[in-house]
């Protein structure tokens, strides 16, 4: 490994609203908005030609466990009223915030999108059961990419530093959400499941690691509470 390495991290949070039928290609909310579901648009389960020199795709069972465990540790911390950070903080305790469980369908759709190596959000990712939110992160290195999934998740969560506690009762509808959306999706009270995908690939001098996590039901609805505050 080179003794001199460059690193960068870019993260995005978002949500796409709508419901879908079992047949991804017949999703009305996609068609109505001129969009195509990820599973319909990209039919191959192998990485696309846009992933130049991809090395490996997917997550190990241990990494999946880490993703779920870390999310739940963070959710429990906030729910218990132990998160003192914010702008201003502290973050209020939650009346209820269930633990997340791993969802294979969410993971399948997330991996399909990751396999395109197109940084950003896919146009339509919902499943029949619920609407789906999404956090996306990419981390690059000029040497060996040793970033871990927990580091990428913690980078999302670090947006709590910018979270005004008043937004817990009403998620902002202006561009403020771009600064806090990763954090709020992680702790969204109505979200119960998570599924993620990941790929390593080469982009010029950068060795990229691209992580996509899908959440259901989705969070980050304007003017709606992030979670119910404990009275």
UniProtKB/Swiss-Prot annotation:
Matching InterPro entries: Allrgn_V5/Tpx1_CS (IPR018244), CAP_dom (IPR014044), CAP_sf (IPR035940), CRISP-related (IPR001283), P14a_insect (IPR034763), V5_allergen-like (IPR002413)
Disulfide bonds listed in the record: 25-40, 30-124, 51-117, 196-213
KW Secreted (keyword) present: yes
Database matches in Pfam families: CAP
Residues annotated as signal peptide: 1-21
Tissues with expression: Expressed by the venom gland.
CDD domains according to UniProt: CAP_euk
Family of this protein: Belongs to the CRISP family.
Identification of the protein by name: Venom allergen 3 homolog
Organism: Dinoponera quadriceps
């Amino acid at each position: 490994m080179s003794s001199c390495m460059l690193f960068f991290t870019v993260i995005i949070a978002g949500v796409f609203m709508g419901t879908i039928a079992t047949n991804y290609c017949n999703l009305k909310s996609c068609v109505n908005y001129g969009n195509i579901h990820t599973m319909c648009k990209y039919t191959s389960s192998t990485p696309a030609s846009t992933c130049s020199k991809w090395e490996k795709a997917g997550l190990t069972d241990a990494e999946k466990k880490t993703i779920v465990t870390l999310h739940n540790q963070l959710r429990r911390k906030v729910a218990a009223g132990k998160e003192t950070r914010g702008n201003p903080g502290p973050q209020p305790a939650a009346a209820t915030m269930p633990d997340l469980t791993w969802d294979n369908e969410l993971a399948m759709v997330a991996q399909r999108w990751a396999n395109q190596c197109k940084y950003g959000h896919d146009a339509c990712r919902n499943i029949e059961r619920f609407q789906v939110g999404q956090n996306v992160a990419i981390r690059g290195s000029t040497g060996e990419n040793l970033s871990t999934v927990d580091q990428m998740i913690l980078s999302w969560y670090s947006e709590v530093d910018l979270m005004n506690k008043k937004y817990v009762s009403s998620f902002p509808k202006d561009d403020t959400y771009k600064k806090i959306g990763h954090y709020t999706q992680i702790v969204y009270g109505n979200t119960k499941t998570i599924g993620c995908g990941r790929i390593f690939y080469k982009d010029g001098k950068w060795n990229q690691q691209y992580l996509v996590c899908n959440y259901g039901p989705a969070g980050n609805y304007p003017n709606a509470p992030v979670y119910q505050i404990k009275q």
